[in-house]
Amino acid sequence: MPSLVGSEMCIRDSTKSLFQTRSIPTNDIEMTIAFYEKLGFEIAFRTVNEAADEKVAFLKLGTLVIETYENKAAALKPGAIDHVAIDVKNIEKVHEMITGAGLNTTQDEVHFLPFWENGVRFFTIEGPNKEKVEFSQYL
């Protein structure tokens, strides 16, 4: 499997930061927001993912952003974080690199959600431990 670090098309050159968000499913978004607000987080953005009928909130403390979404199916046990997201500059280029390196094991395509001011484009792959790694670009 080709490496994406040290190659001509380096993924490091395509990212904006190490991690963009950590995503936590919840059964009660208001309780989750209240908990993180007590820890000093502020609501950075709040919306509804109408396609999935889920309330969504992005909570920010410094450079850490937690995305929480109410899906009524949260595991409520350790290991319940759904995915990590990596912020990229050019989603199409990164998708091409990941797919070309044989890392797009889910065969996921680039999707769009109307989050934030202009939306976000993203795709998700699966790591060797079944963890989800999302690559996303704010528009």
Predicted segments, located by residue:
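Surface-exposed charge patches
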Residues: 2, 34, 57, 96, ...
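Short N-terminal helix-initiation segments at or just after the protein's N-terminus
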Residues: 7, 22-34, 66-74, 99-103
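First exposed extracellular module after export/assembly in secreted or surface-exposed proteins
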Residues: 12-15, 111
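Conserved short beta-strand elements that form part of the metal-binding/catalytic scaffold
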Residues: 44-78, 125-126, 131-137
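Single conserved hydrophobic/aromatic residue that forms the stacking wall/gate
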Residues: 1-13
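Core segments of cupin and vicinal oxygen chelate
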Residues: 16, 23-65, 116
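Vicinal oxygen chelate
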Residues: 26-30, 84-132
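Short, solvent-exposed beta-strand edge segments and adjacent coil->beta transition regions
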Residues: 17-21, 79-83, 120
